[in-house]
Swiss-Prot record:
One of its GO terms (biological process) is response to hormone. The keyword Nucleotidyltransferase does not apply. Residues 1-22 form the signal peptide. Belongs to the calycin superfamily. Lipocalin family. The keyword Lipid metabolism does not apply. GO terms for cellular component: extracellular region. SUPFAM superfamilies: Lipocalins (SSF50814). Glycans are attached at N66, N74. This is Epididymal-specific lipocalin-8. It is found in: Secreted. Keywords: Disulfide bond, Glycoprotein, Secreted, Signal, Transport. Pfam families: Lipocalin. It comes from Mus musculus (Mouse). It comes from the Eukaryota.
Length: 175
């Protein structure tokens, strides 16, 4: 019985690894550049899900091996932007940022959705967050959302339900 249990655990682990590998994309920076609205966040860490500042939207710009991420937040009714410069890592689709932060593009169709994995080293621990973004301000239920749900089935899921006025202003280039 113990051997069968060990075999099943190893089998599940192998399937998980294969599934994780299959989500790697050959990133084309020019195609993923531009506006993205945050729709959903998943993490097994409640601290991450209860963050005071929630990103409403991102604007990605690429130059050489670098990426500039301009994020917009709603802070007490005012839109606040924050920019961060990251550099490409050895693995395609992975970028390192100051402050022990990393972004990994897990999946994208470039036109409608992207799924990012954010990693933050804080107080000696790695925190992982999966985020689902769309290009559209209105339509959040894209085909990639179901993939996101599958990827995050064992984690906490937080759906963003607000209008996203700051994301709208970012898309229009007004912030």
């Amino acid at each position: 019985m113990e051997a069968r249990l060990l075999s099943n655990v190893c089998g599940f682990f192998l399937v998980f690894l294969l599934q994780a590998e299959s989500t790697r994309v050959e990133l084309v920076p020019e195609k993923i550049a531009g506006f993205w609205k945050e729709v959903a966040v998943a993490s097994d860490q409640k601290l991450v899900l209860k963050a005071q500042r929630r990103v409403e939207g991102l604007f990605l710009t690429f130059s050489g091996g670098n990426v500039t991420v301009k994020a917009v937040y709603n802070s007490s009714g005012s839109c606040v932007t924050e920019s961060s410069l990251g550099s490409e890592r050895d693995t395609v689709g992975e970028f390192a940022f100051p402050g022990n932060r990393e972004i990994h593009v897990l999946d994208t169709d470039y036109e409608r959705y992207t799924i990012l994995k954010l990693t933050l080293l804080w107080q000696g621990r790695n925190f992982h967050v999966l985020k689902y973004f769309t290009r559209s301000l209105e339509n959040e239920d894209e085909p990639g959302f179901w993939l996101f749900r599958e990827m995050t089935a064992d984690q906490g899921l937080y759906m963003l339900a607000r209008h996203g006025r700051c994301a709208e202003l970012l898309k229009e280039g007004l912030v």
